[in-house]
């Protein structure tokens, strides 16, 4: 929510309104963000080569295990992403209220939709002045849920379903995700959707990085440094 709507009333509100720094993101959340970012990069690069392997390798096959290393890195990064996501869900329950913004999008609030439209206009350079937000702005919150949360769940489910094929029947992955391939129809369909999901996340990462840098420069609060140190730094003391 906007800054002035998330603080106390009276003299206390005026005092907080003029703060130029608020502690937002706790250490476990920041660590999860950067570990997840690294795992997505590894998954994207290795997944690309798994989908489009190198045409040939010189020498004897026994001396060239490059694709084996690529697959191992992909599987390891997949575990990191999935376990980290489960940890992130846990932290939504035990962390501060900003830790829950990723999962709880207040679509039932009219004010949220109004602020969402303001953010859309701001990103399209149709608004002169942006609003101030302690946590995610409405557009960022919606994008994180639709692209990251939905995307990460989809990629984890389809990825472990394909991983279960290698582990074999009655493996833990087959027991948990064996229903996925029959749902899609066949293994190749899951491969295709998993591959398309990679590009879905690639687009998200590109837009996310661009907007984070843009907002750090032209908005009224910090973004990148906030995810490093946890503090939201404001460039002015106006309330909204």
From Swiss-Prot:
The chain crosses the membrane at residues 31-51, 75-95, 142-163, 196-213. Keywords: Cell membrane, Electron transport, Heme, Iron, Membrane, Metal-binding, Transmembrane, Transmembrane helix, Transport. Pfam families: Ni_hydr_CYTB. PROSITE patterns: NI_HGENASE_CYTB_1, NI_HGENASE_CYTB_2. Signal peptide: none annotated. It is found in: Cell membrane. The keyword Signal does not apply. The keyword Cell membrane applies. One of its GO terms (cellular component) is plasma membrane. One of its GO terms (biological process) is respiratory electron transport chain. One of its GO terms (molecular function) is iron ion binding. Its main location: membrane. It is a multi-pass membrane protein. Belongs to the HupC/HyaC/HydC family. Probable b-type cytochrome. PANTHER family: NI/FE-HYDROGENASE 1 B-TYPE CYTOCHROME SUBUNIT, NI_FE-HYDROGENASE 1 B-TYPE CYTOCHROME SUBUNIT-RELATED. This is Probable Ni/Fe-hydrogenase B-type cytochrome subunit. The gene is hoxZ.
């Amino acid at each position: 929510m906007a800054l002035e709507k998330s603080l106390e009333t009276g003299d206390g509100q005026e005092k907080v309104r003029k703060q130029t720094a608020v502690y937002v993101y706790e250490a476990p959340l920041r660590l999860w963000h950067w570990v997840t970012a690294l795992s997505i990069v590894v998954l994207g690069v290795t997944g690309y080569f798994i989908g489009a392997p190198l045409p040939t390798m010189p020498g004897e096959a026994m001396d060239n295990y490059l694709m084996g290393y690529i697959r191992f890195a992909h599987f390891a990064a997949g575990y990191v992403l999935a376990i980290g996501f489960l940890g992130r869900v846990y932290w939504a329950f035990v962390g501060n209220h900003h830790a829950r913004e990723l999962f709880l999008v207040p679509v039932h609030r009219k004010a949220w939709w109004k602020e969402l439209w303001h953010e859309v206009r701001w990103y399209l350079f149709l608004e002169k002045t942006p609003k101030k937000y302690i946590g995610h702005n409405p557009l960022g919150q919606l994008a994180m849920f639709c692209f990251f949360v939905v995307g990460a769940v989809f990629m984890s489910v389809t990825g472990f379903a394909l991983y279960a094929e290698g582990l074999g029947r009655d493996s833990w992955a087959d027991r948990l995700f064996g229903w996925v391939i029959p749902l899609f129809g066949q293994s190749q369909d899951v491969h295709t959707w998993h591959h398309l999901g990679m590009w879905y996340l690639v687009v998200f990462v590109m837009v996310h990085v661009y907007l984070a840098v843009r907002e750090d420069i032209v908005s009224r609060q910090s973004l990148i440094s906030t995810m490093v140190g946890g503090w939201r730094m404001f460039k002015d003391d106006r309330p909204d």
